[in-house]
Regions:
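Cell-envelope and extracellular/periplasmic
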Residues: 1-121
Length: 121
């Protein structure tokens, strides 16, 4: 659905880097158990469709959150880090350390932004 509604429309255009800020609503146990394979498929298909085998992906790690603690959340966080080691041209921006655990979105977005900029240099 994301592909058809958003990405397919921009296929004629080119870009070098994708920032993947994972949505919190699809962080279930089932999704956590296939998350690394999902990232492999995502990166592979986007590189193929946009005809750019060197397309970089920067993944913004799920933030820590008290209401979301548990297996699925932590598994996705760890798979996001694992992706950096196992999928070419993938980097993960850690954000567990800039969270207050109350708001699902980290308040220190300047820190996250700087980490992204540092990866792009």
């Amino acid at each position: 659905m994301l592909w058809e509604n958003m990405c397919q429309r921009i296929l004629p255009f080119a870009f070098n880097t994708v920032l993947w800020y994972q949505g919190e609503s699809n962080a279930s146990v089932d999704e956590a158990n296939i998350y690394l394979e999902f990232l492999r498929a995502l990166t592979s298909s986007w590189r193929r469709e946009f005809k750019n085998e060197n397309m970089r992906f920067i993944i913004i790690q799920l933030a820590d959150h008290l209401d979301r603690a548990g297996y699925a959340w932590e598994k996705i966080q760890s798979e996001q880090l694992r992706a950096e080691k196992e999928i070419p041209l993938v980097n993960t921006v850690v954000c567990r350390d800039v969270c207050d655990n109350i708001d699902i979105h980290p308040k220190e977005k300047d820190v996250l932004s700087q980490r992204i900029v540092d990866l792009l240099k």
